[in-house]
């Protein structure tokens, strides 16, 4: 009887230990899942910030910030539809992108109010898919301007200058999300011409 009782206690102890080990394994798995979910949320927020910094830099004529959002070998192009060839571009690399969108802006000298006068980009409906250190993004945009870079504020009514969607590819480099490819698909645009 004494051995049976001891064996029962030992068996119960082993069972309890097995249960605790199993519980710890479940907690570790849950913690990993939680960390993965948190990383996904952080990635999404960081990618949205890239899109917002892009719009703000373009709106204010901050060429340095604008090109810093692209990888050194990034590609930028404009299309009427995703299946069609670009009607503007491709521009390859930061220097080519800067030359196209900020041809007369020296380094460290933002223009006042963007190159078309007061401008606002409205970017919305983000569809973001992250796969470790790469991501694809689709977002819609409307660009509103008060035309004339050298006209007094309020002298020209705001107009829609462009609208469409962004089809982006981003990569994480040195802990930062950057555009590796940006395709602007336009539904309406004016004044977009290649710079020589």
Question: What are the roles of these predicted feature ranges?
Answer:
Residues 63-142:
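A solvent-exposed, acidic/Ser-Thr-rich amphipathic alpha-helical stretch
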Residues 37, 41, 88-91, 157:
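Charge-dense, low-complexity intrinsically disordered segments
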Residues 8-11, 38:
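Alpha-helical segments embedded in low-complexity/disordered contexts
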């Amino acid at each position: 009887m004494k051995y049976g009782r001891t064996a029962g206690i030992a068996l119960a102890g082993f069972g309890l230990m097995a249960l605790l080990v199993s519980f710890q394994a479940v907690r570790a798995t849950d913690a990993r899942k939680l960390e993965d979910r948190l990383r996904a949320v952080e990635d999404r927020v960081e990618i949205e910030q890239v899109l917002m910094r892009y719009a703000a830099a373009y709106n204010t004529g901050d060429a340095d910030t604008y090109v810093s959002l692209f990888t050194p070998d990034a590609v930028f192009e404009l299309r009427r539809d995703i299946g069609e060839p670009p009607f503007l571009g491709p521009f390859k690399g930061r220097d080519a992108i800067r030359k196209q969108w900020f041809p007369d802006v020296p380094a460290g000298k933002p223009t006042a109010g963007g190159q078309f006068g007061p401008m606002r980009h409205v970017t919305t409906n983000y569809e973001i898919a992250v796969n470790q250190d790469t991501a694809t993004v689709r977002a819609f945009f409307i660009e509103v301007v008060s035309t004339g870079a050298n006209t007094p504020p309020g002298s020209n009514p705001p107009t829609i200058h462009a609208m469409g969607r962004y089809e982006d590819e981003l990569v994480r480099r040195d802990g930062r999300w950057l555009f590796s490819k940006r395709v602007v698909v336009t539904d309406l645009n004016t004044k977009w011409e290649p710079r020589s």
